[in-house]
């Protein structure tokens, strides 16, 4: 069964190389760990050990991204690729751009859901969303989040 994770909108309040050619955007906070990062197998461990289950799929890796003016519709074209789970501002994302309060950041990824999951409930886990996200699957808005770690 083909699931198209059409777009995840991260509207940040404060706020391209191809996958095979991924590289950090600059040398900010360079570490041995970052130098050993494999963009084809990014942080493969289960993200929430307390909820670990046998059937799961890691969506870390290369996603399309676009930065648009706040309030614009979903983009038809994306500006490049971003390495998830790293923030767009970080070097390890491969982007290294800062988003301001007049902009929104869109992520897009297509993936296959294993046929054995047909008819089962599927949990999409986001390790962090910095302020606001609208989640779309197959052109259908399936959820939203507002908050983050702000007091």
Across the structure, where does each feature detected by a protein language model lie?
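Bacterial Sec-dependent N-terminal signal peptides
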Residues: 1-22
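Generic structural signal for beta-strand residues in well-ordered domains
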Residues: 7, 13, 56, 75, ...
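N-terminal pre-domain segments of enzymes
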Residues: 21-57
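Extracellular/oxidizing-compartment recognition motifs
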Residues: 22, 27-30, 37-39, 88, ...
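A short, polar/charged loop/turn motif at coil->beta-strand junctions and beta-hairpin connectors
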Residues: 23, 27-29, 53, 57-59, ...
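Generic detection of short hydrophobic beta-strand segments and adjacent strand-loop junctions
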Residues: 57, 82-86, 109-111, 145
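Core domains of carbohydrate- and sulfate-ester-processing enzymes
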Residues: 59-104
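Accessory beta-strand-rich segments of carbohydrate-active enzymes
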Residues: 64-68, 97-151
């Amino acid at each position: 069964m083909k699931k198209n994770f059409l777009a995840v909108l991260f509207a940040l309040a404060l706020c391209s190389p191809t996958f095979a050619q991924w590289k950090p955007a600059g040398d900010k906070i360079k570490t041995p760990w970052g130098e050993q990062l494999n963009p084809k197998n990014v942080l493969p461990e289960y993200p929430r050990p307390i909820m670990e289950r046998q059937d799961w799929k890691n969506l870390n890796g290369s996603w399309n991204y676009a930065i648009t003016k706040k309030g614009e519709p979903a983009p038809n074209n994306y500006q490049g690729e971003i390495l998830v789970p790293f923030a767009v501002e970080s070097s390890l994302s491969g982007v290294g751009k800062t988003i301001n309060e007049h902009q929104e950041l869109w992520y897009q990824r297509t993936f296959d859901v294993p046929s054995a999951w047909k008819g089962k409930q599927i949990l999409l886990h986001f390790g962090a969303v910095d302020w606001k996200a609208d989640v779309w699957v197959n052109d259908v808005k399936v959820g939203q989040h507002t908050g983050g770690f702000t007091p």
